[in-house]
Amino acid sequence: MVASIMLVFQLGLLLCLLLVCGLAPGFYCVRRLPWSPMEKLCGGAGLSLVLLYLAAWGIYCLSPRGAAGAAVQTGAFVVVSLICVWLGILARQDLSGLLRSPRVRRVVLGFAFLLLWTVVMLAMIRNYSGFGWFGDWLEHFQRSLFFLHRFPADTPIVMGYRLPARPPMMNVLVAFFLAQTQDRFELFQVASAFLNLLMFLPCCLMLPALGLARRPRILPLVALFAFSPVVMENATYTWTKSLSAFFVVLAFWFYLAGWRKNDRLRMAAAFLALSAGLLVHYSAGPYCLLLGLHYLLRVFWKRPRKWRELAAIVVPCALLLATWFAWSIAVYGPSVTFQSSTSVTFARQYQGNNLAKIGANLFDSIVPYVLRSGLTYSGQLNPAGVLRDNVFGFYQVNLIFGMGLAGGPLVLWLLWGFIRRHSARAREWPFWRLLIPCCIIVGVAVVGERDPFGSAHLTLIPLEVLGLSLIAAAFPWRRVAAIAVVAGCLVDFSLGVFLQARVEALANTPRRTVFAAGLNLRSGSLQPTHNSLSGMAWQNWYSVHRFALSRQYLGSLAGYLPPDPADRQAASRAQAQLRRVLDEDARYWQGWWQRHDYTLAFLGDDVAGESGDGAVVPQFELVILFLALMGALLREMRPAPPRRLPQRPPSRRSRR
């Protein structure tokens, strides 16, 4: 009971820190700029994250190092948070003025609803799984602990990576918040979900720029995000692609606005956002390349004071990127820094023709695997697992249906309409007609491996959420389109969101066994003895329980003395293997598992309880939220009643 109360308190403190530190410092800096309220909201959030990263990274690099596994100086992080609170107090009148904007209020309420929706989903999840996805969620937790607990530089990362294989910004940000609460995985989940949901803000900012409605509404975009399997999976799965997409979409807005208004500050903000996105995830690289080329070839030579603007772009971006790359080169060397990413390592391992690989990956990212080759992951005891994995592959790794069953085709239809007719925004739509295919081709080209299931989830998430924004900008939809979108949302939520969370809620209870592992004496390894879902789902479960299971079987073997010498040798080898597994806690995690009693708990585990009965509550809540949101969307789709003009009384003719 005390632990549950402490977790609730820590979650409340975490949300307060996320709200204050995620907006106040950046908004204080931009509050007096001649920007729109939405630009101040989104730009303030983006700049706040950059400033927090710089502060946390400076603390990590400059504070005195203690023993491996010791937490970074918490007091320094508290000071940074207090400064954020102070800046928020100084800007309170401007914040009040910002919230007086009706559009900002609707966006803030929409984000709050999406955060509630996502936390309810996290309260369901007890084991990450889906298709062939494995381990990334645990890897990013270890990376955050790396910066929080000052792991030695030579600490290996799970999945066989080195630290420079992925950029650090989101992991450093999460470490900043964990340092002021606790290094629990449940808090890591909520902090990651909050940061990943931020991409909703620049998508709302982009709505007017899409040119389909003079006053675009926010509710349709809220519904499309909540019902999107891709958005919700990337929000609940604790990796970093969605936060990178936040910076990329924000950069698109500031780039177009700076180009249209000849505004040097907005143009510099666009490339600073791209640099931040690259520090979150290298999937922002294609967008940095293409926007940089477009600026140099199409925009730069026509800009007033172009060299001063170029300096205003290059210097801040170079300084921001140097915080990571200069440090990594100094610690790991240039070879590890630039050649340990998955794009480089997988490209080296691929033996075939690169052009053929790019073409095949592009085709497979457009045509779903289930339509090309039939069902996969079919050898599962649970039919819901088979359906979930095939639906997961249909949505998550596909460029078209990643925007929804009906949303993807509708986006293609809307884009085709813009191509056919001359748009009023003649300056911007040619930009999109060029950028979209280039981003798709380059985004697939940088994928190192050959993936027959599709590669859209690696680099194309910014385009997918912009596609959802395009659908929302077209609201109110025509009758046929409205029926298709609503029906598609029902299918997307049922099969892509709710079913996914429902299968991820499956875990062992006193009345049901979903996963189990037994010791193979000959190999000395733990192997599945019962698995209701796919092999990858079992691997994700095993990665959480491997230390506890190793301790359990090591204790069982302590008194095991078989009469057969061969069996004794096998038992001795098994004990040695189990000890090697336990030694990985010190090697990879610097004793984190031991300090936490070899237990990693999901937020869904805390809600479900030991009996598992509590798991029903968030499922019921998610259905209620779905009905409420769908009802609000249907009410929004009703045609407005005609306004009745006041009738003038008949004029009296004067009698003569």
Residue ranges of model-derived segments:
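Membrane-embedded, hydrophobic transmembrane alpha-helices
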Residues: 1-105, 397, 581-640, 655-656
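Hydrophobic, aromatic-rich transmembrane alpha-helices
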Residues: 24-31, 296, 379-428, 467-470, ...
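Transmembrane-helix motifs of polytopic, lipid-linked glycan transferases
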Residues: 24-28, 80-93, 186-212, 250
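Membrane-interface alpha helices of multi-pass inner-membrane proteins
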Residues: 60, 222, 266-282, 288-292
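Signature aromatic-anchored transmembrane alpha helix within multi-pass, membrane-resident enzymes
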Residues: 110-111, 272, 292-293, 314-318, ...
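Short acidic/glycine- and proline-prone juxtamembrane loop motifs at membrane-interface regions
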Residues: 230-244, 282
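Perimembrane helix-loop-helix junctions
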Residues: 254-257, 261-265, 287-318, 326
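Membrane-lumen/periplasm interface segments of specific transmembrane helices
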Residues: 309-392
